[in-house]
Amino acid sequence: METTAILLLHCPDQQGIISEVTKFITDNKGNIVYLDQYVDKVDGMFFMRIEWELEGFLIPRDKLYDYITTLYAQRYKMKFSLYYSDKRPRMAIFVSKMSHCLYDLLARWKAGEFNCDIPCIVSNHEDLRYVADQFGIPYYVWSIKKDHSNKEEVEKAEMELLKKEDISFIVLARYMQIISDEMIAEYPHHIINIHHSFLPAFIGAQPYHQAYERGVKIIGATSHYVTAELDAGPIIEQDVTRITHKDTPESLVLKGKDLEKIVLSHAVSKHIQRKILTYKNKTIIFS
């Protein structure tokens, strides 16, 4: 498979952006293999994802970022990110005691669905070490006291591990701890959470029990980027399933677990493929 460059950009909408960027690529012998764009009419913003093959491309990789900055970013007031398909993201998974999302992520990774590396799994409990062992992934445990008196110390150790392993992004696979503002600042829009409800409904703990008490007719799951405000980050993926008055809190939990696995895996896949742009508190998901 040919190595490709992936350019994600957004800027105020104006005439000629697509033409300028595609001409720059083709004039330098790049073969464009993907292009998707969107205009937000309300805010007047332009968003684009473009990918091209690097074989025969005239501009060296170590110069490309500077070229784009000089030629287009300043001129169009453009913000952009540049990635390469042969540089695999490195994902850390954080878990607590529930295994369903962890198993699903690791099975998909083992099957080749995720083009990434998983150097470590981090937990606040020993419970899921056997899962990590099955897949040959190092498992690190830092227990957090009930009064959270060692939380800062634990996060410092976790951050040292993440930096040592050159982690690109973090997935909270039902990790039942609140991430500090300091860690979020180190990985802005690079920490993915799965919340077991159709946000913004039923935030916080036990959403399935909240849904049962409310008598809702659908339940859902939401994957989002983590921000300082609990369960309020940019939403990446959501799904729902219908329920009836015959469902119990226990049956809702079982149905919800299936949703959580699907929604989280889709969000992770889109992040790995560089198909997500964040703007304000929303995401633009490219096809």
Give, region by region, the residue ranges found by the protein language model.
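A conserved regulatory-domain signal marking ACT and ACT-like small-molecule sensing domains
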Residues: 1-89
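Short internal beta-strands
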Residues: 116-127
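Short hydrophobic segments within beta-strands
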Residues: 10, 92-94, 122
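Short, low-order "capping/linker" segments at domain edges
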Residues: 85-104
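Donor/substrate-binding cores of folate-linked one-carbon enzymes
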Residues: 124-125, 149-153, 165-287
